[in-house]
Regions:
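Elongated, mostly alpha-helical coiled-coil "stalk/stator" tethers of large membrane protein machines
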Residues: 1-181
Length: 181
């Protein structure tokens, strides 16, 4: 239920941001606010049904002030606080990013590799992501993960393409164990 609810709020906020011409900035603000409310100090406020609405609203306003949030995001946070729905903020931010990516015709790809990639290797993987998604605009994030042993893992919109040596070795080990019994 919270996924659907978060998506509905995200659609509404996207519409407001579109009208204001603040699509990207609103997404950044939502992600900052979601990360802030997910901090251990504020998490009890988000999850506790015993905290009254006035206290949640005061805290939400304080966070909005500290983060310098726009009126659109500030009002959203106040509404979520009033309705004791601040817990959906991380999902709402993810939905917003996803809807915004769709609207702007772009895709996100997370690239994990065992070693640092050269510019040519990175560009080749981005080109692969373009072919797989059919989108020309690709937002990429790279990460080195030595535990992969070799190869790369691509996460494109939640679909994982695992070409790591670690996974290949695990698959081979499993096949050998099953074949040997």
């Amino acid at each position: 239920m919270t996924g659907r609810l978060a998506k509905r709020y995200a659609r509404a906020v996207l519409g407001l941001a579109r009208e204001d011409g603040t699509l990207e900035a609103t997404g950044e603000e939502l992600n900052r606010a979601a990360a802030t409310f997910d901090e251990p100090r504020l998490r009890p406020l988000v999850l506790s049904p015993v905290i009254d609405a006035a206290a949640r609203l005061r805290t939400a306003a304080g966070v909005a002030d500290a983060l310098g949030l726009s009126p659109t995001v500030r009002n959203l946070i106040a509404l979520l606080a009033e309705r004791n729905r601040l817990a959906i903020l991380p999902d709402l931010a993810r939905w917003y990013d996803s809807l915004l990516d769709d609207e702007l015709g772009r895709a996100r790809v997370a690239i994990r590799s065992a070693t640092t990639l050269s510019a040519a290797e990175r560009n080749e993987l981005i080109e692969l992501a373009r072919r797989l998604t059919g989108r020309q605009k690709i937002l990429s994030a790279t990460e080195v993960d030595a535990e992969l042993l070799g190869g790369v893992v691509l996460d494109i919109g939640g679909t994982v393409y695992d070409g790591s040596l670690r996974t290949q070795l695990a698959r081979l080990t499993k096949e050998m164990a099953e074949g040997g019994s």
